Amino acid sequence: MKPTAFDYIRPTSLPEALAILAEHSDDVAILAGGQSLMPLLNFRMSRPALVLDINDISELQQVRCENDTLYVGSMVRHCRVEQEEIFRSTIPLMSEAMTSVAHIQIKTRGTLGGNLCNAHPASEMPAVITALGASMVCKSEKRGERVLTPEEFFEGALQNGLQSDELLCEIRIPVPSQYVGWAFEEVARRHGDFAQCGAAVLIGAEDRKIDYARIALCSIGETPIRFHALEQWLIGRPVGNDLPADVKLHCREILDVAEDSTMTAENRAKLASAVTSRAIARAADRIVHLDVKRG
């Protein structure tokens, strides 16, 4: 298959791109890495009048860390998140999770912003971003800048909170304390496939009792699920050998998941409980090692 005919514009600055979006917002497709858009065009599932290619906008490719916040341009490629030291040293959870995302060919072209805008329920990065408490910075010529939380940005399966004339420009990610343990775990049919279930975990402890927890799951619902109930249950719990088994049992009791064509609700709850307990065990192990270094 080949795409239907469309106009093509490749701006070199953000103001230029926003002006084009303002003029053509009713029938435009934004080309970032193209890993989702190009198949849709080729199968004629998407038939835009205009394709706006944002690959030459340098403002969207920058990464910097200031005041305990990592500022990531929406056009930063997956391979940079996985490999560059600024990510590995400040937010290693992202780099670890990125090893499970797709394959090297896709990671070389795919972008963080494009992945988030695609908002696939089984995608890893939306869950990671949710666990980290990141903010999405959206800009338009008319509205200026809007900053959305993950809960505001991810509206449903393949649905995001962008207005038709807006562009996701930056992701702002709070840098966790160096004493916070972290881990990402998932189960997929093959490495690089979409997750059947994934868990992103951040936990901290003082005197070997958990005093901080942020957990988000993917492939459980239409959007990333922030596991507030488990976070609250973890606070005050001791970090020890019994923690993973206790977490697994408690998850089974409180998880509410829907059945779909790929898995029964019971099996998905079992899978999510196992994946979450495994991630918490690894994050807790990192807390122990950090405590040793701190001591």
Curated annotation (Swiss-Prot):
SMART domains per record: CO_deh_flav_C
PROSITE patterns recorded: FAD_PCMH
Any one GO MF annotation of this record: oxidoreductase activity
Temperature dependence: The caffeine dehydrogenase activity increases linearly from 25 to at least 66 degrees Celsius. An incubation of 30 minutes at 70 degrees Celsius drastically reduces the enzyme activity to 11% of the initial value, and 77% of the activity remains after 30 minutes of incubation at 42 degrees Celsius.
EC number(s) reported in the record: 1.17.5.2
Record note on quaternary structure: Heterotrimer composed of an alpha (CdhA), a beta (CdhB) and a gamma (CdhC) subunit.
This protein's name: Caffeine dehydrogenase subunit beta
